[in-house]
Amino acid sequence: MDMVRYLISVVSVAVLGGCADYDAELMVADQSQDTAPLSFAVISDVHFGSTTGEGAMVKVPRALKYLSSYGELDAFVVVGDLTESGKRSEYELLVQVFADESNLSYPIDQFLFMMGNHDNYNGNAKSNYQKSLRPFNGGENYPFHSYCVIKGYPFITVSMFGTESNDIDDPSAGSEAYPEETIEWLEQKMALAARECPDKPIFVFTHMPPRWTSIGTWTEHGNGEAWCMSSLNPVLDEYPQAVVFAGHTHYTLGDPRSIHQGVNPDSKRQNYFTVINTSSTSYCELPYGVVDDGVKPMGYDCVTEGLIVNELPNGDIEIRRYDTYRNEEIYPDNRWVLKAPFDGSQFTYADLRDADDNPLGKHLYDGKPSPWFSEGSSLALEVSSSSVTVTFPQADDNDCVSRYSIAVTDVELNEVVASASVFSLFYLNSDMPETLTHTLSGLAPGKEYSIEVRACDSYENVSAPLRSLFRATSSALP
């Protein structure tokens, strides 16, 4: 890591409490002589100290190696939850990994960090963060928030402070995570970015996603307990050129709802900007209530993901999604592109969640066409006196098949007697199985049943069913 070539960008915040250094300065690598287009990587939720699956000491070096192998990066951003519980020993593991140049395919001069909720789970959390990350800031305390310009693009990082909760049901949690001093600082830096870089997007990085934006931030749309805060919405809503990268949810990048742009500049939701979910480099989860296996279905600890953001020759911004567990791009034929000018006029990533707040009648993405099974697909059944085990092929979709709805109907009564919602395992990408098998119980011996399997995408578009009739076997003789 080159610690010689630096410019100083002053980042001061006047937040009360503890003995933390709230006037720390970020040392910014001098890239003024580099004329190559901007390119940077983003990951989040690395959770050093966690032993989920292979653990951070295996998963994060692999992610660094893979993401840096695709070309030279101007910055590498880690969007909070750096640690499992904010301990100094956990930060020491992080420094060990990120300072080891053998973990990088190409050198990276600029690492950007910020605090997430897990980084506050310690009485010395702020001090541990600032002191431990000194190797990435010229030996000086690492700042909580930072502002810098890299190749003409403004970068703003915003730490969140001591809370374990979102502010959906407890607004005080939001004011604790993002206190007034942080809000005022962000207002100043957003205004500065707009003045210094008037035709550029403003890249903002913070752990907790703004409400009513990407996946997991809409309690109105079946996500159960939301994973968001509305604290920053009023500031960001003033800047349609804001591009916010947020983690926390651990939701997979393969879900098309991982990117969102607003449709109404006057919305009470205050969401007229871009938000991109950054997933996790520890493990992935699903929204509550989607599949029967819960938020951590099979393979959840074998999923780590990240992003590479590239400046295109025409000034647009391209976002590539990567599976850093398997070293492969996620949906390379469907890369996200943020189009210039960045004033909201080119927003294309709004969807049906905005249907009740679309006075300008903008196009809302609905995920169609519905998923489909290949011609000739069929069900394979194993039947007992009380259950049926069904094996079926994976369906196709223009985005991803999220889950399968299975229903067993009593033919005589015309009543559904057993049902299931089965995860497709799409987040395993090339390791996604070609077929799935599931058992449904509660059948009566000797009765005739029909079984249907339908594929569903993230927008609940449903395929035509695969169907089969069968009869439960008779009970064994005593």
Residue spans for each PLM region:
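N-terminal active-site segment of His-dependent metallophosphoesterases
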Residues: 22-91
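A short C-terminal boundary segment appended to hydrolase-like catalytic domains
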Residues: 34, 296-412, 416-420, 465, ...
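C-terminal motif of bacterial Sec signal peptides marking the signal peptidase cleavage site
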Residues: 17-18
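Extended active-site neighborhood of metal-dependent phosphoesterases/phosphodiesterases
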Residues: 87-191, 195-197, 231, 254, ...
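Active-site-proximal segments of metal-dependent phosphoesterases and phosphodiesterases across multiple
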Residues: 55, 164, 168-179, 193-246, ...
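Beta-strand-rich modules
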Residues: 443-459
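Active-site neighborhood of phospho(di)ester-bond hydrolases with catalytic His/Asp-centered motifs
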Residues: 42-44, 75-81, 110-117, 203-207, ...
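Recognizes extended acidic, P/S/T-rich segments that occur
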Residues: 403-444
